[in-house]
């Protein structure tokens, strides 16, 4: 069974989603199915079919979450250190073309969210950053073309 690297915060977030799906969403869906059944004929009952579809989606996500949680290799980022970039690092970059500064944290695939600055360990930019250090320049081939970034700061917070 292949381990999946994950930050402590990401692990807690997945556990909370699993709890919510099992203890709140599952009973709500079961109640919706029960109510729809009470309306009689199920063949043309859109409410029933929608509730059954929601149940299928929820149960699939529960199975997925249980798998990720079982395979999680939880890494406490605050205990990491060093000059080289690795999983969990928070990196401040300078886009050499636009002079725009960006801050990213390298996290596991399941906790990645570019809007909040969390990038997947398997993303092109994270792969380019791993093993580098402050002062290095990386080139990232993105859909919009190649970008050069200077690594300004590396932290483990």
Curated annotation (Swiss-Prot):
One of its GO terms (molecular function) is RNA polymerase binding. InterPro entries: GreA/GreB_C_sf, TF_GreA/GreB_CS, Tscrpt_elong_fac_GreA, Tscrpt_elong_fac_GreA/B, Tscrpt_elong_fac_GreA/B_C, Tscrpt_elong_fac_GreA/B_fam, Tscrpt_elong_fac_GreA/B_N, Tscrpt_elong_fac_GreA/B_N_sf. It comes from the Bacteria. The keyword Iron-sulfur does not apply. Pfam families: GreA_GreB, GreA_GreB_N. GO terms for biological process: DNA-templated transcription elongation; regulation of DNA-templated transcription elongation. Keywords: DNA-binding, Transcription, Transcription regulation. Necessary for efficient RNA polymerase transcription elongation past template-encoded arresting sites. The arresting sites in DNA have the property of trapping a certain fraction of elongating RNA polymerases that pass through, resulting in locked ternary complexes. Cleavage of the nascent transcript by cleavage factors such as GreA or GreB allows the resumption of elongation from the new 3'terminus. GreA releases sequences of 2 to 3 nucleotides. Belongs to the GreA/GreB family. PANTHER family: TRANSCRIPTION ELONGATION FACTOR GREA. This is Transcription elongation factor GreA. It comes from Bartonella henselae (strain ATCC 49882 / DSM 28221 / CCUG 30454 / Houston 1). The gene is greA.
